[in-house]
């Protein structure tokens, strides 16, 4: 799917929920390579969206507010759609809790601009020395989730599937079935499943092994069971898709 192409408009989507203490610092850390910033308030009880609107002077920022909580996936989809309508060509997603370094945005965008990838995602497991600082249960949990993701998505070379620092070409994003993608914490891994159906090229981008971003949002030990079920369902869907494709080719 990947062709050489030049992206001239980069947009950042920031889903926010209970992140009032960090959101302004995240926005301030985003460099001039980004043309537009979409802060999606997912019906946040502390009014993060209103707080940004009242205190942020960055003219690139647009605040979008959900009247009902839709989960991180729902917030990202809302941001994607707004950015696509406004003409963005590369869509970056970064969390609002300050655990992701905005200066790395260029690293995520460059492979897409150069036509090397359709979708880039963070990987905190490149540096083994830094990984050793993680709690063992977290290392084990991520290893299990990564293995499940490899089976269900077909991307055998990727790791750290729950990492939410990502970038995607708008052309590819516009082909995703937004209404079918998981809205909650399974969002990132479900994205990989959908991208493989599109034959999209996915690339891991090394980043610091900061595991604090998962503490406030999810606990791996509590969602492995749920993820196992959902990965199993995705694997069944993938087998059905491949079987259907083979039957069509056979009939020809």
Identify what each model region corresponds to.
Residues 1-7, 179-252:
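Hydrophobic helical membrane-anchoring modules
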Residues 9-11, 36, 190:
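Cell-envelope/extracellular polymer assembly enzymes that use nucleotide-activated donors
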Residues 11-15, 38, 65:
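Short hydrophobic beta-strand elements that form part
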Residues 17-32:
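Short, well-formed alpha-helical segments that are part of the catalytic scaffolds
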Residues 21-25, 46-55:
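Acidic helix N-cap motif at the loop->helix transition within catalytic regions
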Residues 41-50, 68, 98:
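A conserved acidic beta->alpha catalytic loop
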Residues 66-85, 102-185, 212-222, 226:
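Acceptor/aglycone-binding surface of glycosyltransferases and processive sugar-polymer synthases
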Residues 88-99:
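Short beta-strand-to-loop acidic/aromatic patch adjacent to the donor-nucleotide binding site
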């Amino acid at each position: 799917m990947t062709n050489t192409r030049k992206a001239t408009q980069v947009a950042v989507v920031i889903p926010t929920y209970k992140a009032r203490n960090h959101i302004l610092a995240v926005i301030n850390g985003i460099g001039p390579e980004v043309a537009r910033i979409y802060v999606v308030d997912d019906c946040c009880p502390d009014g993060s969206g209103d707080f940004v609107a009242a205190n942020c002077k960055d003219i690139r920022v647009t605040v979008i507010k959900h009247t009902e909580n839709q989960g991180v996936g729902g917030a990202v989809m809302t941001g994607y759609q707004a950015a696509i309508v406004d003409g963005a060509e590369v869509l970056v997603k970064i969390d609002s809790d300050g655990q992701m370094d905005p200066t790395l945005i260029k690293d995520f965008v460059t492979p897409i601009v150069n036509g090397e990838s359709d979708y880039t995602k963070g990987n905190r497991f490149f540096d083994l020395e830094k990984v050793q600082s993680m709690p063992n249960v977290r290392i084990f949990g991520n290893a299990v989730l990564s293995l499940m993701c490899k089976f269900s998505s077909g991307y055998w070379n990727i790791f750290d599937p729950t990492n939410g620092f990502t970038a995607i070409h708008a052309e590819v994003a516009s082909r995703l079935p937004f209404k079918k993608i998981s809205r909650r914490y399974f969002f990132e891994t479900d994205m990989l499943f959908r991208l493989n159906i599109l034959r999209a090229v996915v690339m891991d981008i090394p980043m610091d092994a900061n595991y604090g971003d998962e503490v406030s949002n999810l606990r791996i030990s509590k969602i492995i069971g749920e993820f196992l079920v959902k990965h199993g369902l995705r694997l069944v869907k993938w087998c059905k898709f491949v079987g259907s494709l083979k039957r069509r080719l056979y009939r020809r």
